[in-house]
């Protein structure tokens, strides 16, 4: 764990006084012109119904209305278009090539073989023929056209899955540690993730009404009230994870709310350290937006974890900024009111004080590849999936077909990791040989080079409307060039975290990678260095607006210096700080301070 988490506290600073009561009542919200546009959309939506049902019947367009485009996120979807086709369609005076991205809610990332087969069928029938494992332990479909939305969601529902709250201003998909060697701890983490997901799920019946042709609740929207969320839901997205040391593969410090398992010497659960206020997104050129690593709030007993989760979320519901969405995440709420005031209000709502955090140690945030035997004697195979894209590559690995064949004979389950990989889990010893045969037959990858196995990339172009540059499509080529530079300095087998996003919203968590690339414009990136290998420290901007072709040459001298000057066991992110190439980021507010190279590379 990065030592900045236990450093001496900063000098006292002045914080604003928290509101005494919930600031947004329905009556206030309805007439408050100062609220962001999204707040008015939520208030008028009838608990997330809007005009979605009518919009699906408008066959003259592949899109939906702008307001419904915000509401459909709560249902687990984003309206997108193929940006590669925009110029041609504009020239022909055609509408954009609209389609929808659909994201599932899969708490803890666990699916059965039956569910896997159904999800595979959906990908081939209604989407673009691929499954995309995300950085938050679930699946996304891309390329689903409006006329297929209902069919797709009904097929998902048929195998007891859904997309409710996978996006939007709610508690989103809850992640859980997947370390297969720690069977008991994983089970505890998974149970908590499931319980939080179910407990904080929106209660509106809108999803079933619209997508499954369910009946409207008697009495209409007034009886479909949200007892926790209310009409306005949360000010912004809210992300929750459950981690089990020593692995931080869920990147607990990058999320709004985290639970870190504290285990005894027999790996039995003693309780949870609670973290609050992490988040990656920011906006280029706006220093009042920044990534932030979470603070340790305290320790809670296992029986209190659900109460703590709801309390943290509802304090954010009541204290969060509903006027400016760019400053609406929990990280800004804590910066505004202070951790002490936030903790006091959480404790008041829980009904008891939190204890002080317990010691723990993370050693990294990557996955363990290959076969691992769990404490219960079951076996687990972690497969490397480049950028999480499960597809068949002509002349290369056939992930879609290979994993389908495994699902047809597998008796355990599948687990998605926060690093976009897939675990074939709970395999009896006698079934390993057949799975190994299928892995070899379909060219699936058990491992990868050191740089690739520690890499992440978001989707970006052509479907993401926010992307400023390529990510998933460019990352493999860039990794090849960086691997060549590392090999030249004897560093081919050095584990270094490297992540890329097409914009600064940070879906692939680039600001806690030792090397982070963030899209600035077409074929141009900001380069960030100096994060901790275990995900506990933010990086710092090293070079601004770098041409994609120049990135290897920019980093090569640093690789050479690292090979010459590192001390035994020193990670690359720690080295560039110790050697004076970049400043250490203590936390979010100073992320934009002292940027750029502090000295030239010898």
Swiss-Prot record:
Region called Disordered, residue ranges: 1-23
MF (Gene Ontology): 4 iron, 4 sulfur cluster binding; heme binding; metal ion binding; NADP binding; sulfite reductase (ferredoxin) activity; sulfite reductase (NADPH) activity
> Which terms does the UniProt entry file under GO BP?
cysteine biosynthetic process; hydrogen sulfide biosynthetic process; sulfate assimilation
* Pfam families given in the database record: NIR_SIR (PF01077), NIR_SIR_ferr (PF03460)
Per the UniProt entry, the signal peptide is none
| Enzyme category, top tier | oxidoreductase
Question: Which pathway does the UniProt entry assign to this protein?
Answer: Sulfur metabolism; hydrogen sulfide biosynthesis; hydrogen sulfide from sulfite (NADPH route): step 1/1
Q: Which UniProt keywords apply?
A: 4Fe-4S, Amino-acid biosynthesis, Cysteine biosynthesis, Heme, Iron, Iron-sulfur, Metal-binding, NADP, Oxidoreductase
* Cofactor binding note of this UniProt entry: Binds 1 siroheme per subunit.
Instruction: Tell me the residue numbers annotated for binding siroheme.
Output: 507
What the entry lists under SUPFAM superfamilies is as follows:
Nitrite and sulphite reductase 4Fe-4S domain-like (SSF56014), Nitrite/Sulfite reductase N-terminal domain-like (SSF55124)
Report the family membership.
Belongs to the nitrite and sulfite reductase 4Fe-4S domain family.
State the protein's name. Answer: Sulfite reductase [NADPH] hemoprotein beta-component
This protein's species is Methylobacterium sp. (strain 4-46)
